[in-house]
Amino acid sequence: MSSREEVLSLLRGEEGFLSGQDLSRRLGLTRAAVWKAVDALRGEGYEIEARTGLGYRLLAAPDLMTEAEIRSFLAETRVVGRELRCFQELDSTNNYLKAWTGGPDGAAVTAESQTAGRGRMDRSFQSPRGQGIYLSVLLRPGLPPDRLPPVTALAGVAVCTAVERVCGVRPGLKWPNDPVLNGKKLCGILTEMSLEAETGRVQSLVLGIGINVGQRPEDFAPEVREVATSLLQVLGKRVSRPRLTAALLEELDKAYAALLAGDLSAYRAAYRRDCVNLGKTVQLIPFGGGERETARAVDVDEEFSLVVRGADGRERTVRSGEVSVRGLWGYTE
């Protein structure tokens, strides 16, 4: 931890003023080094009051996706987020983790912006600087491939729970994994799997999550403006990205523990409650082209695939790699 981070940590732990002498003594720094650290923190956007005879007091922190800011809100986790790296810019947080040979289970990476963010079906994911949470987590579950299809759905439930904890509003889930608010997409989730060439065993999973936090309508490209939203648009106020990121890491840690334990009953119940498609007539749009079909979404099965009832009254299961689901009149409705 740098001297700047050490000073910040002590200031966070005090409700009132902390003298320069106390900071110097507790950190083993000179008074000049303490002043230099405070000056550097102010340069990063921290509002620090200084009073003669009293010392320093932290008044406000900037909305920065730094390790220090995220960890200031983060409770201890078992696996997810114990290793955390934060960057100003990456081409893709998923790409970074896929290239990290030997990265530990649960390692997490964030970026203030991405130049080549991606969503499902290799679609572009817009990642403007300072407006969202762009997070990827590396998982090494050591499970057979047939135990892993629920991962993305579990991440969707984790996002909904984290947003509810921090913002007081719970998103719904458009099958299979899009958190939505007011009928518009709030978040994108992409899971990528790496297999061992010789054995076909799962080497790792990279789970990428992008949450729209501070975007205004004009910040979205015209082609996604009608289907995308942000927490700012829904709530009418700014949300702390570090605080929400910390809550998300905690919820992902719980979901990962449930996956490893093989007990997903609570997550299936939450997913069924959150899924905005259940009980509604939807459009099934085949990937790769083909005729659209209208059916009624009636259930979610053990692997979080969608059970639909066609016009002939027969029920069947559709999987996320086969079709995209839309409402009759819009993204969800």
Enumerate the language-model features and the residues they cover:
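Short, ordered beta-strand-loop transition motifs
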Residues: 50-52, 174, 300-301
